[in-house]
Amino acid sequence: MTSAVAVFKTDEIQGEVVVTPYKSGVKLNSYFTRLPPGKHGFHIHKAGDLRGEGCMGLCEHYDIGRNTHGGKPGSTRKRHTGDLGNIEIKGKRQEFQKSYFLKGIKPKDLWGRSIIVHKDEDDLGKGGFEDSKTTGHSGARIGCAIFGRSTCAPKTLKNRRH
């Protein structure tokens, strides 16, 4: 099965996102073992150009329509295709795992695109800030990864022995 995979490997952020076909879209499985404390905006971005400081070459949020920023998949209001809400590690386990379902796209649509962890909480487009309707006022880009093509058997971070 062909999928899309993005891997985060920095001192602050470690994790991976695996995208596989699912019904009329994709299933996006995210798994993180290291994140800074607090909630962080989590979005798929349009480009995959890592040149430049702080993931700045990755452009705006990925969207197959003409939508404004909104909540996570499954929200009742219109949203960018790449709006995934917030991620946060809670408790002593120090890991975050969540699955998302995105309609109308295939794993290959994400190849070469990026996924970003932002410094601050995403206001889901509901804040009164100038950038609430475009970025969710999520702040700086503190971690980014590019989706690559994978056709091999999954070797997920969760299943590896260290």
What spans do the regions from the language model cover?
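N-terminal leader/targeting pre-sequences
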Residues: 1-162
